[in-house]
Amino acid sequence: MAKKLFTSESVTEGHPDKICDQISDAILDAIFAKDPNARVACETSVTTGLVLVSGEITTNCYVDIPSTVRQTIREIGYTRAKYGFDADTCAVLTSIGEQSADIALGVDRALEAKNGEMSEEEIEAIGAGDQGMMFGYATNETESYMPLAIDLAHRLARRLSEVRKSDILDYLRPDGKTQVTVEYEDNRPVRIDTIVISTQHHPEATQERIRRDLLEHVVFPVVPSELLDESTRYFINPTGRFVIGGPQGDAGLTGRKIIVDTYGGMARHGGGAFSGKDPTKVDRSAAYAARYVAKNVVAAGLAERCEIQLAYAIGVAQPVSVLVETFGTAKIDEEKIGELVKNNFDLRPAGIIKTLNLRRPIYRQTAAYGHFGRTDLDLPWEKTDKAAALREQAGL
């Protein structure tokens, strides 16, 4: 039996980089609530006592960005100056411009439309907002069709915030990280080898109490007991102290947790971040579409694991390439799966936006604890509504 260990991490909503992701997406949502056709590329940076919001936004509506920033920080839990960062006293600076006219030219009217290659109906198609490649992944090793390590890391991080906000563990503070190492035998998860949790805390909380409480209230309620054994290792605040955290401890930036946002390193990544971007940016929308395709392929039973690569040219609606990789787990020929994908999914940016109904204020909720496998949310790219048709067309 081939054994191997695989590790993924997650972070809480109070992590500096995740604060930035949530602010960027909160601004996007606030704009989309008033102007669904807005173009938004919003970047955020945080450090001790300071938030800087910059980027390019083209819209016909007004949004109070400083108020949106402060409300987001308040909801995360930075509400006291003693935490080193406070929603009411931090400075908020903004530097916003409009989308480049050259980029808008390519997005507004796709290259195929300008060349007269599309029907009147298809002229509505939007050209890709940039070049690049995006990946989507799914596996049948969990009910969420996500790799087990990242699935558990997210659930632990979310639980860490829950016990803080509900005052079950009232000495916890917003910043925190989790990490899970899974042991695989013949590519199937069999046990948890290591769990790491680091959480910001009140200076008077002892290491012994933190360890005992986190095992009782976070680890054991989340991780299935059959995956734990006497050899499982637990590292709880392994430095021994985590009082200085959040933006006081580390500066944060939007888009710095792209592996946490996706598949925990189990799948490849094209390099583009999600938060703060409207769906004409294929970095976001095509990555969601690739997950949608991969999940439906696996849910249909066409493969046990599936990775989809999509690639685009700026201003061109049709993807320049679509690749299906099943890692030797396909039940039918991979080329046949590729044909089914092309026949059942519209992977032009306009097609993705329409299919997944992406011009809505749904993004802030995705900006912490992962964009995929979210059983706690009703996200359109997580639906398996194409699985039955794929299975029937595959003859299974």
Curated annotation (Swiss-Prot):
Details of cofactor binding: Binds 2 divalent ions per subunit. Binds 1 potassium ion per subunit.
Main localization, broad class: cytoplasm
Cofactor: Mg(2+); K(+)
Keywords assigned: ATP-binding, Cytoplasm, Magnesium, Metal-binding, Nucleotide-binding, One-carbon metabolism, Potassium, Transferase
Catalytically driven reaction(s): L-methionine + ATP + H2O = S-adenosyl-L-methionine + phosphate + diphosphate
Residue sites binding Mg(2+) per the record: 17
Gene Ontology terms: biological process: one-carbon metabolic process; S-adenosylmethionine biosynthetic process
Residues engaged in binding L-methionine: 56, 99, 250, 281
GO molecular function: ATP binding; magnesium ion binding; methionine adenosyltransferase activity
One GO CC annotation: cytoplasm
InterPro entries found in the cross-reference section: ADOMET_SYNTHASE_CS, S-AdoMet_synt_C, S-AdoMet_synt_central, S-AdoMet_synt_N, S-AdoMet_synthetase, S-AdoMet_synthetase_sfam
Subcellular location: Cytoplasm
Binding site for ATP: 15, 175-177, 241-242, 250, 256-257, 273, 277
Binding locations of K(+): 43
EC nos: 2.5.1.6
Plastid found in the keyword field: no
Pathway: Amino-acid biosynthesis; S-adenosyl-L-methionine biosynthesis; S-adenosyl-L-methionine from L-methionine: step 1/1
Annotated spans, Flexible loop: 99-109
Keyword Transferase: yes
Subunit structure: Homotetramer; dimer of dimers.
Record family assignment: Belongs to the AdoMet synthase family.
Function statement: Catalyzes the formation of S-adenosylmethionine (AdoMet) from methionine and ATP. The overall synthetic reaction is composed of two sequential steps, AdoMet formation and the subsequent tripolyphosphate hydrolysis which occurs prior to release of AdoMet from the enzyme.
Protein's recorded name: S-adenosylmethionine synthase
Phylogenetic lineage: Bacteria, Bacillati, Bacillota, Clostridia, Eubacteriales
Gene symbol of the encoding locus: metK
